[in-house]
Swiss-Prot record:
Function description: Component of the larval cuticle.
Any Gene Ontology biological process: chitin-based cuticle development
InterPro entries per the UniProt record, alphabetical: CHIT_BIND_RR_consensus (IPR031311), Cuticle_Struct_Prot (IPR050468), Insect_cuticle (IPR000618)
Superkingdom: Eukaryota
Domain (Chitin-binding type R&R) ranges: 39-100
Organism field: Drosophila melanogaster (Fruit fly)
Signal peptide bounds: 1-16
Protein name according to UniProt: Larval cuticle protein 2
Keyword Signal tagged: yes
Lineage of the organism: Eukaryota, Metazoa, Ecdysozoa, Arthropoda, Hexapoda
Keywords from the UniProt entry: Cuticle, Signal
Amino acid sequence: MFKFVMILAVVGVATALAPVSRSDDVHADVLSRSDDVRADGFDSSLHTSNGIEQAASGDAHGNIHGNFGWISPEGEHVEVKYVANENGYQPSGAWIPTPPPIPEAIARAVAWLESHPPAPEHPRHH
């Protein structure tokens, strides 16, 4: 339950801090909202008139699966799916930045180092 509250807080803060580019965002209405909290987990969802969406499901073990999304200032639908479990928060989506590929020379150097471990050091006596 703690993870659920934390994730909703993060989503809420991110939504609150996002720059508002359209005047109708200020007057967005909640079109639908559902919260079902049970002993074995929960389900929740939210949909607003300006395109903000959120849905999450959790189980009694603290595992949560969900997604959230909004309409960008460019008019594109941004969606992030996530899993939160014993391995932490794991977001995925086309909008999540990815690191650039490792340069070929670096990859070769790492492969060489892995195939040639250093010789064991012998203690020196004085």
